[in-house]
């Protein structure tokens, strides 16, 4: 169904391996994330959702699991495969991600002395059983030989610690510690993964099974990881020590025949370490007993169901491929354990410490919602679960209600950012409340509205009132000393987007109370009705904040408010929002290297019916910070290549869906709000399955036939 063939891209050659400038592709199954390696065999970084290093002086960070996926090959008493590969002694290299089944395939031929060894590796994380992962290595030699493979579960090295909780962003400690070059150095210095201590190892050569139990630093969550080895094994011996459970397996390769090694990896959690280890070992052995083909068939069937919802674009092959790859990244990185949210850089990269920022609520989550509301629900449920933290944060700041942190730890929702001043970005709190409302719009479940959404929306409405300042001589409420979405403005008064979001949330809270038959605080309506939204007194246009009568240079503030806060905008205002596009800045300005803001320009162009501008912005969105050498994955900005930027994936999909179809969220699901607009050059835009109110819908925009929304069986 979907088989992206990357042979024509850079992946016919290995990446440089320089993680500071080029990140690797990732696999995910909603529970575990795994980075790939060039040769498919080396140990790579692996993470599990909600497993967090809780070291007190440091920031909480995603903890690196013990390594489990490596197969250290060598000819018996001969050359090492990894060393030969690194030395360039390979040919016919190819690496693919089969997006239909989230399977990474790597193949090449190595010259090891006088032996030509063909290596074919497949790696995948089970979607049908999220606690399983598989690696299969198939070997073919041109002459008789014996191959040895070191396998097992190993501890990772500890990392240097720094007192990030006491640092001040950005003008004091950071430049001193980094020696300048913040973006270039923060990835290795600040965004390293957290640590897990291996506390027990087990397994035996007799069972060809090895495992370890590990605890995230400072009494964090515990995990058991085990592998069972299958395939054409001739001999097994143990090589374990106190911190590493490992073995050496041997394969006899007759000339021209193919033999294989299979790693069946199992992960367990939520128990004491000895029980975790025992459970993981048993699960790995059970997976081996079931067999690779059976497990893969179940895994592929789950992916086939997910891919009933996809996007197809006729008339632009590049955009079609990038949109589907972006959707693939959202599917991979949406947690299936509903205690945990989506993370800004997904499950396999420690960028932003694994935190939850506004990017999740407004871009990646919102991009996934129409395709898979049952997966997307993990983020609003996380916001509900961490409401007590938000209530506490509001109290500590001297306000009523709930105040969500700018960077929330996915473990417990507490403030987990070094940028204390960014907690002035209170628009984040209002967007959390909107997340709850939009999830209800998607599923139409009043029980969810009452139990999950309402407590958050009511508490945020209280905060919106408490944080607003009444200015009696103006007869209005204002927001002083805030940071808006256009962060270069710094701390300002009366950010347009912040005020518009607050007004919207207050009115949505009143509406939610009406639906549920509950009482709404009259102050909510009073504050909403008297909220100050700054306008230019001469033009009547919205202005970005009260200290500037000029539009924002790139119109980020205004366009963000038009879409997220549903702020009314005249045709003249929308055309003004497109000025940066008309000037070509959307192509040439390095500040437009942030994929998220382009979403709003795309939507403004679509509302105007400007097909050429719409196409131009989408072209930029589908190419900016996209690395074909890592399967088209995105990074955030120049110098910040810490991992796949999931925000950009959701941003492109929102522009296509809401701009192309004109459909927007309402209490009835996705309903028409604006005329559909196909970008120039595109003949047909199809969403094969969008889901709202427990019903599947196929949505198509055709250049000749217009918009068609059909209910699916």
Describe each region flagged by the PLM.
Residues 50-118, 612-713:
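Non-catalytic C-terminal accessory modules of carbohydrate-active enzymes
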Residues 1-352, 713:
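Acidic/polar, glycine-enriched structural segments that form the non-catalytic walls/loops
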């Amino acid at each position: 169904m979907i088989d992206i063939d990357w042979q024509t891209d850079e992946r016919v050659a290995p990446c440089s391996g320089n993680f500071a400038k080029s990140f690797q592709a990732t696999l995910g199954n909603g529970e575990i994330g795994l980075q790939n390696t060039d040769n498919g065999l080396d140990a790579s970084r692996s993470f599990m959702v909600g497993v967090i290093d809780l070291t007190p002086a440091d920031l909480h960070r995603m903890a690196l699991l013990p390594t489990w996926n490596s197969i250290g090959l060598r000819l018996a008493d001969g050359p090492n495969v990894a060393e030969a590969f690194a030395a360039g002694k390979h040919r016919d290299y190819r690496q693919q991600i089969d997006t239909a089944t989230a399977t990474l395939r790597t193949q090449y031929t190595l010259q090891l002395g006088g032996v030509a060894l063909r290596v074919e590796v497949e790696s995948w994380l089970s979607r049908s059983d999220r606690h399983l992962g598989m690696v299969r290595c198939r070997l073919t030699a041109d002459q008789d030989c014996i191959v040895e493979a070191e396998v097992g579960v190993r501890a990772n090295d500890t990392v240097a610690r720094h007192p990030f909780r006491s640092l001040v962003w950005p003008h004091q400690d950071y430049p001193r510690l980094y020696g300048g070059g913040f973006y270039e150095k923060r990835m290795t210095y600040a965004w390293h993964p957290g640590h897990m201590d291996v506390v027990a190892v087990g397994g035996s050569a007799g069972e060809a099974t090895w495992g370890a139990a590990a605890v995230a630093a400072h009494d964090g969550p515990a995990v058991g990881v085990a592998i069972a080895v299958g395939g054409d094994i001739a001999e097994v011996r143990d090589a374990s020590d106190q911190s590493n459970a490992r073995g050496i397996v041997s394969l006899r390769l007759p000339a021209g025949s193919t033999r294989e090694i299979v790693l069946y990896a199992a992960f367990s959690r939520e128990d004491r370490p000895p029980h975790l280890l025992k459970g993981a070992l048993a699960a790995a052995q059970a997976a081996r007993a079931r067999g690779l083909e059976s497990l893969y068939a179940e895994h592929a069937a789950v992916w086939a169901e997910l891919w009933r919802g996809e996007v197809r674009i006729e008339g632009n092959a590049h955009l079609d491929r990038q949109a589907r790859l972006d959707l693939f990244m959202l599917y991979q990185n949406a947690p299936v354990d509903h205690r945990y949210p989506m993370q800004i850089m997904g499950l396999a990269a420690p960028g932003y410490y694994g935190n939850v920022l506004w990017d999740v609520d407004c871009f990646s989550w919102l991009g996934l919602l129409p395709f898979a509301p049952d997966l997307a629900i993990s983020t609003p449920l996380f916001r509900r679960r961490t409401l007590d933290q938000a209530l506490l944060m509001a109290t500590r700041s001297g306000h009523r209600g709930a105040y969500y942190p700018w960077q929330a730890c996915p473990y417990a929702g507490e403030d987990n950012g070094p940028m204390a001043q960014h907690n002035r970005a209170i628009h984040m709190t209002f967007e959390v409340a909107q997340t709850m409302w939009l999830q209800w719009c998607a599923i139409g479940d009043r029980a969810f509205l009452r139990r999950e959404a309402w407590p958050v929306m009511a508490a945020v409405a209280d905060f919106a009132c408490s944080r607003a300042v009444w200015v009696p001589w103006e007869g209005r409420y204002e927001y002083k000393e805030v940071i808006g979405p256009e962060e270069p403005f710094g701390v300002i008064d009366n950010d347009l987007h912040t005020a518009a979001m607050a007004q919207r949330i207050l009115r949505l809270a009143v509406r939610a109370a009406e639906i549920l038959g509950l009482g709404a605080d009259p102050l909510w309506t009073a504050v909403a009705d008297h909220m100050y939204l700054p306008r230019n007194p001469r033009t009547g246009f919205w202005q970005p904040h009260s200290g500037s009568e000029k539009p924002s240079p790139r119109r980020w503030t205004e366009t963000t408010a038009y879409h997220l806060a549903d702020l009314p905008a005249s045709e003249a205002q929308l055309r003004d929002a497109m000025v940066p596009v008309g000037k070509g800045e959307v192509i040439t300005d390095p500040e437009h290297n942030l994929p998220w803001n382009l979403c709003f320009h795309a939507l403004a162009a679509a509302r105007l019916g400007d097909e050429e501008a719409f196409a131009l912005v989408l072209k930029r969105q589908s190419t900016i910070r996209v690395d074909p050498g890592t399967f088209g994955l995105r990074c955030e900005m120049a110098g910040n290549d810490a991992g796949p930027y999931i925000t950009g994936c959701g941003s492109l999909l929102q522009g296509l869906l809401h701009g192309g179809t004109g459909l927007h969220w309402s209490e009835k699901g996705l309903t028409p709000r604006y005329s559909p607009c196909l970008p120039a050059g595109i003949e047909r835009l199809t969403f094969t399955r969008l889901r709202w109110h427990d019903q599947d819908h196929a949505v198509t925009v055709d250049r000749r036939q217009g918009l068609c929304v059909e209910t699916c069986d």
